[in-house]
Amino acid sequence: MSFSVDVLANIAIELQRGIGHQDRFQRLITTLRQVLECDASALLRYDSRQFIPLAIDGLAKDVLGRRFALEGHPRLEAIARAGDVVRFPADSELPDPYDGLIPGQESLKVHACVGLPLFAGQNLIGALTLDGMQPDQFDVFSDEELRLIAALAAGALSNALLIEQLESQNMLPGDAAPFEAVKQTQMIGLSPGMTQLKKEIEIVAASDLNVLISGETGTGKELVAKAIHEASPRAVNPLVYLNCAALPESVAESELFGHVKGAFTGAISNRSGKFEMADNGTLFLDEIGELSLALQAKLLRVLQYGDIQRVGDDRSLRVDVRVLAATNRDLREEVLAGRFRADLFHRLSVFPLSVPPLRERGDDVILLAGYFCEQCRLRLGLSRVVLSAGARNLLQHYNFPGNVRELEHAIHRAVVLSRATRSGDEVILEAQHFAFPEVTLPPPEAAAVPVVKQNLREATEAFQRETIRQALAQNHHNWAACARMLETDVANLHRLAKRLGLKD
């Protein structure tokens, strides 16, 4: 089989039509799935010996949240090491990373698998994976044809990474660095709230402003602080963490500013505080609303003048520290109640960020669940950990008062429970493995009972016509995939569609 000029032109056009990289990547994957008639396709970015999904089609939504480390996925490692098209035989003993992750085919293993490494020059930047349920599904395509597809995908991904780096260099001071894959922190989520938060992080990271990060417990405020630091000019210097809620009043000042020998009972030597440790770097003060008013005053002085005094020392030390603070309280209300200094609040909240709770993040819960499933798989040495449809439905309708932290613990507990009731190293998480209280699932929609105005033949044809239409819509008008879904021969499906008036 040879790709026509029209097919290749259509792929190139789809890459130009998208608004933003994510949309272009999704258009590319959707188009390739139609052209190659595969059951699943994915575009992956390579970073730090792991593949990160950027766009998928035909795979469970939680795949977008998974991070595929090469050490745990020998097929992906083989793709990363190859310089060309990789075809895995149907009887390959290497496990497929997408086994159990094709909706409707959870119990079946992928049979046909092709991997296309993507390069920018000599640098591996990603991969394109094509999977099918039939062993010989991709035999009709030559390696040369697949190389053309890989070249188009590599160009799109390379341009996207280069644009991201150029945009980053425009915001950061200093000379431009040579091209390399853009580093990203593990901030998983595609919801509007998370997309906006990532944009704000990118903006404020390039500055040296203090940042106040607010959000409920368990939303990931520390992760936001880490993302800001890693994207800032201070990234080469330390990020120092201090939980203000865990500080006894008697040692809080010493923890922040240090002390000299003999300053108090037990001070047997000089000790640097967190501000000194973070010099030229970043200090993250978690739960800053827990600090006493006396310590708030001393912290304010550091922010104003940039100098500190160790406990028991009359000398001042100059420090250059960027402060990121986090709280789960409403500090405006704390100021009105007299429990937090207004001047410190204004110093800290030069650029406020708000982390949305998990219940407001829509499908992000499924992406995060996929991420934690993959973490559990690696930690416990399992071959696969997948979510059943019932488990996904449950997760999407639970309120998660404990936010992302509660989801993480729930996934870990469910994996342990499922593993205890199954033999082997494959784990499927069902709804009953989660102990969520008072989860109200929407009732299944009752099927409408039509008023019969047709004879049996007409009613049968109407049913067949609608069934085929729905199957085509679900498979992006891919007739081969539609036939597999309906469990019929593709030639018979074409003939039936013509008889029903669905094809010319």
Curated annotation (Swiss-Prot):
Pathway: Nitrogen metabolism; nitric oxide reduction. SMART domains: AAA (SM00382), GAF (SM00065). Required for the expression of anaerobic nitric oxide (NO) reductase, acts as a transcriptional activator for at least the norVW operon. Activation also requires sigma-54. Disulfide bonds: none annotated. Residues 479-498 bind DNA. Keywords: ATP-binding, DNA-binding, Nucleotide-binding, Phosphoprotein, Transcription, Transcription regulation. GO terms for molecular function: ATP binding; ATP hydrolysis activity; DNA binding; DNA-binding transcription factor activity. ATP binds at residues 215-222, 278-287. The lineage of its organism: Bacteria, Pseudomonadati, Pseudomonadota, Gammaproteobacteria, Enterobacterales. PROSITE patterns: SIGMA54_INTERACT_1 (PS00675), SIGMA54_INTERACT_2 (PS00676), SIGMA54_INTERACT_3 (PS00688), SIGMA54_INTERACT_4 (PS50045). One of its GO terms (biological process) is phosphorelay signal transduction system. InterPro entries: AAA+_ATPase, GAF, GAF-like_dom_sf, Homeodomain-like_sf, NorR, P-loop_NTPase, Sigma_54_int, Sigma_54_int_dom_ATP-bd_1. This is Anaerobic nitric oxide reductase transcription regulator NorR. The modification 4-aspartylphosphate is found at residue 57. The keyword Endoplasmic reticulum does not apply. Residues 187-416 form the Sigma-54 factor interaction domain. The gene is norR.
